[in-house]
From Swiss-Prot:
InterPro entries: UPF0324_pro (IPR018383)
Species of origin: Streptococcus agalactiae serotype V (strain ATCC BAA-611 / 2603 V/R)
Keyword set includes Cell membrane: yes
Membrane topology recorded in Swiss-Prot or TrEMBL: Multi-pass membrane protein
Name the UniProt record assigns to this protein: UPF0324 membrane protein SAG1125
Keyword GTP-binding: no
């Protein structure tokens, strides 16, 4: 496939990403990826000459998305995460476990598509859209499945930002306790920021930094989760063939790890991590571009038809994470 054949589709996704990005800055609680999916769905309903754009759209939804995940690694200082986030590790492990268990059980009960259930379970438990972006290519998720999972995650991000500060005060969480709660029970990084900022405004505190570090610690779970899912998916789809390490280990996850290691080395040498800021911004913009591509290819009728069960699954994962996060805090004495 010649690169010039991809240019029209890339340009279309770029054009969709620009207003989506601006709307995301104006309404961060909703976020640019959600706007990109919505605009992409509208564009996909009307645009003609699909043959001209399809190759670039496919390239964006797969390879630009994987590049975004790699660039995400430049925001992770592993030493800082291990130093500050290690205390939250038991809570993180338990919340991730309960979300994945709930997703597995309810997928069977609701007879929901396995791919959608996996994306919602991973997105709820790790880091929202970024986790979905990392998982989707590993399990060969379709664009409308990714769009549905992102939409479900977005709904509960909004609810968390609106409800959690009041809930935290009602049950008597300390500032440290709320930072752990927001960092482990809110899906997306931007929503963690919004939730912690709302708490700080009400209580005149400074929980944002702590909540963000806990959230970054959760992000590292992308690595083992994608590898395990890759092994499982490969064994399911290639039962007759041998499964090698080179086949099951997603290359973009390796590059994500290398980017994180480079960030850690640069930080340990005393350099400011602001030099990576453009790459972090580019990562977010690439995710928006990819969500635009996914929106274009989304089957709206299927999205509406299966949306109810997906929302119920997302609600169950979300409530399970809330209960486990608060229960673990009570047990560990971090309330």
């Amino acid at each position: 496939m010649l690169f010039k054949e991809k240019i029209p589709g890339l340009i279309l996704c770029f054009i969709i990403a620009i207003p989506s990005w601006l709307l995301g800055l104006y309404l961060p609680l909703i976020g640019a990826p959600v706007f990109a999916i919505l605009i992409g769905i509208i564009v996909g309903s009307f645009y003609q000459n699909r043959q001209l754009f399809n190759k670039g759209i496919a390239f964006t939804s797969k390879y630009i998305l994987q590049t975004a995940v790699v660039l995400l690694g430049f925001g992770l200082n592993l030493m800082q995460v291990m130093k500050v986030g290690i205390s939250s590790l038991p809570i993180i492990i338990m919340t991730i476990s309960i979300s994945l268990i709930i997703a597995y059980v309810l997928q069977k009960l609701f007879k929901l598509d396995k791919t959608i259930a996996t994306l919602i379970g991973v997105g709820s438990s790790i880091c929202g859209g970024s986790a979905i972006a990392a998982t989707a290519p590993v399990i060969n998720a379709k664009d409308d499945e990714v769009a549905q999972a992102i939409s479900v995650i977005f709904l509960f991000n909004i609810l968390a930002a609106l409800i959690f500060p009041t809930l935290g005060n009602f049950i008597g969480l300390s500032d440290h306790g709320f930072a752990l709660f927001a960092g482990t029970a809110v899906n997306d990084t931007s929503s963690v920021t919004a939730t912690a900022t709302a708490w700080d405004a009400i209580n005149h505190s400074n929980t944002l930094g702590g909540a963000t570090i806990v959230k970054l610690t959760r992000t590292l779970a992308i690595i083992p989760i994608t590898i395990v899912l890759s092994i499982y998916h490969m064994k399911q789809t290639q039962k007759e063939q041998s499964v090698s390490v080179t086949k099951i280990f997603p290359k973009f996850v390796l590059y994500f790890i290398l980017a994180s290691l480079l960030t850690t080395i640069v930080a340990s040498l005393g350099f400011s991590l602001r030099i990576f800021e453009p790459l972090k911004v580019l990562s977010k913009f690439f995710i928006v571009m990819a969500m635009g591509a996914i929106g274009i290819n989304t089957n709206v009728s299927k999205l509406i038809k299966t949306g109810g069960k997906s929302i119920l699954l997302g609600a169950a994962c979300w409530l399970g994470i809330i209960i486990v996060s608060l229960t673990m805090q009570a047990i560990l004495g971090t309330w």
